[in-house]
Amino acid sequence: MQYKDENGVNEPSRRRLLKVIGALALAGSCPVAHAQKTQSAPGTLSPDARNEKQPFYGEHQAGILTPQQAAMMLVAFDVLASDKADLERLFRLLTQRFAFLTQGGAAPETPNPRLPPLDSGILGGYIAPDNLTITLSVGHSLFDERFGLAPQMPKKLQKMTRFPNDSLDAALCHGDVLLQICANTQDTVIHALRDIIKHTPDLLSVRWKREGFISDHAARSKGKETPINLLGFKDGTANPDSQNDKLMQKVVWVTADQQEPAWTIGGSYQAVRLIQFRVEFWDRTPLKEQQTIFGRDKQTGAPLGMQHEHDVPDYASDPEGKVIALDSHIRLANPRTAESESSLMLRRGYSYSLGVTNSGQLDMGLLFVCYQHDLEKGFLTVQKRLNGEALEEYVKPIGGGYFFSLPGVKDANDYLGSALLRV
């Protein structure tokens, strides 16, 4: 059946029907259109999530035991401060900016339009906290002759050296200080970085930067779901329970009985590794071989021969590695012996995707971050066990560094690094 339109041209009835539906939708009378209008777009955060916040003051810095947020950035800086007084000014200023940014508030107005705006404006007129955490760590180089801090250097802090499989780029290594910035959304992370750089032009210079992510649903699980890395395997299954305070005192935090400088108590050693994946090569590798390399089922995350992700592998009943290979990643990283208990660490890694390399390969990988009370017993011991593992054929560490995450800020009269600088 056909109708004539207002110009006298024959028009199919289906087209005319669509026009009627469109008119009803504009009038608010179409149930389908109304339903779509009230639905949130996929992946968007509710207002409650944007206003989620982590406490800033406390014995420890946020961003270490905090359940992983979806977006993350690592930024290493060279410190431009000329003396210890300048360094104190830097740490006080960073503390002030962190306190504001993590708790949120109205964006500052610019009183004189002839001057640069006081805020980048990328979050609008209200800066939502968005579950933001900013964790400040210091590198080995901060304890050189510039500030007279050498006697106070954490005992196990050292410059990152090359392991056999490393292909380190000097431009992506080390730093006087490192910021780990995490939030629910990437725009909040970027806003925080720009705010910090704007306020410290004479005190900090960016050395290197990398941005990372985990899946939105893993972040929303608040630590109950293990993130999946870009090799398709769950990453962090064997992490110790971050909600167990007694265990965290043993694994993560520097304590008084370690004979470290007194100011380090409540802080943590941080190892950072930028690891590039050969994803094209990996994607052409048979599933069975992939699972043998990791020692886990790719879909469930369970140790091979077991049913569930968090099942504990029984290496004693598999001494020849017939079920879980002797050189598998999980068996080398954590042999589950009495001796290996001292090398536990808390992993907080993120995936990255950066474009393509000069050779035309996808530049994807892992921003590996871990925290431990002792760098030598933790990351360094584990990495030595992993030297020569089968996974090395598919991964290439290209940067990173070792740092010490400062203890927390007690209250509004305190500042990050105060115990270090008052010595």
Swiss-Prot record:
Binding of heme b: at which residues? 236-238, 329, 334-336, 347
Q: Which UniProt keywords apply?
A: Heme, Iron, Lyase, Metal-binding, Oxidoreductase, Periplasm, Peroxidase, Signal
Pfam families xrefs: Dyp_perox_C, Dyp_perox_N
Q: State which Enzyme Commission number(s) the record gives.
A: 4.98.1.1, 1.11.1.-
This protein's cofactor list reads: heme b
Q: How is the cofactor bound?
A: Binds 1 heme b (iron(II)-protoporphyrin IX) group non-covalently per subunit.
- Which superkingdom? Bacteria
> What biological process terms from GO does the record include?
iron import into cell
Q: Where is the signal peptide?
A: 1-35
* Any coiled-coil regions, as ranges: none
User: Mind listing the GO molecular function terms for this protein?
Assistant: ferrochelatase activity; heme binding; metal ion binding; peroxidase activity
What about PTM? Predicted to be exported by the Tat system. The position of the signal peptide cleavage has not been experimentally proven.
SUPFAM superfamilies documented for this protein: Dimeric alpha+beta barrel
The protein's name = Deferrochelatase
The gene for this chain is efeB
